[in-house]
Amino acid sequence: MSTLQKTLIAACIAGAFVPAAHAEKYFSDSSISILYSDDYQAFGKTKTTQTFFTFENATGHDWGSTFFFVDRNQGHGKDTDTDDLYGEFAPNLSLSWLTGNKLGGDGLIKDFTLSGQYEFGGGTNVNNYMVGPGIDWNMPGFMYFVTRFYYVDSETSDDYQTTVVWGKAMEFGSTRILFDGYIDWSTAEDDHKSDFHFNPQLKLDLGNYRGSPGVLYAGIEYSYWNNKYGLNDDVMDTESAVSALVKFHF
């Protein structure tokens, strides 16, 4: 086991097994999503029709936060053999909590983090281990806005990744819209290209009309993925896929 993997595992354990007497849980949110698109990019410069079933869980604590999701995709027609499973687990340790000193506050920077991420499965059957610093921002108008800067121990040559995650709610009378998503950008190395993935969702809060905001959403997801999986255009075209989605929180 590499030093990076040991560091990541230690961070996960430190966050997940904080003694109950010294830990406070702020929230836990789970959701199930269904997405459908005819435009997902596949190997061989072809497009595929897929339905994705996604389970997500996010938690917030005084010591930091966790995020976990797993995707199960179902191909259709000629793409029925493209089914696979992909997931990520991302713990974040608050450096304010870890050091006992308030490193952020009411200004632009909310906190600094030690962040990790484990990626598994998917079309290339990855096992990637990621660790690095992060910043949680007090971005005006946003529910959350975070940046992460990872060193990536991957099955190809190790590289670096910058991740931006955001969530913003917009209200127009009784209509509530949620705009959230992420951006991943990773560096190029000898055996793979730099890749850029922009993946926002725009969702209508259906539950808000019945007095239950934040429960049931319907909308679209857009995936723009240049050099998908670090592959160049000779192998796979840039992905530009719009998906219909429904999402239920519980």
Segments and roles (model prediction):
Residues 1-27:
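Cleavable N-terminal export/targeting peptides
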Residues 22-28, 63-67, 95-113, 138-145, ...:
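Short loop/turn motifs that connect adjacent beta-strands in outer-membrane beta-barrel proteins
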Residues 23-73:
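Short glycine/proline- and aromatic-enriched beta-strand/turn motifs that initiate or cap beta-hairpins
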Residues 34-40, 72-76, 116-122, 149-155, ...:
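Transmembrane beta-strands of outer-membrane beta-barrel pores
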Residues 55, 89-91, 131-133, 164-166, ...:
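Membrane-embedded beta-strands of outer-membrane beta-barrel proteins
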Residues 150-215, 224-226, 248-250:
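Outer-membrane beta-barrel transmembrane domain signature
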Residues 238-250:
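Outer-membrane beta-barrel "beta-signal"
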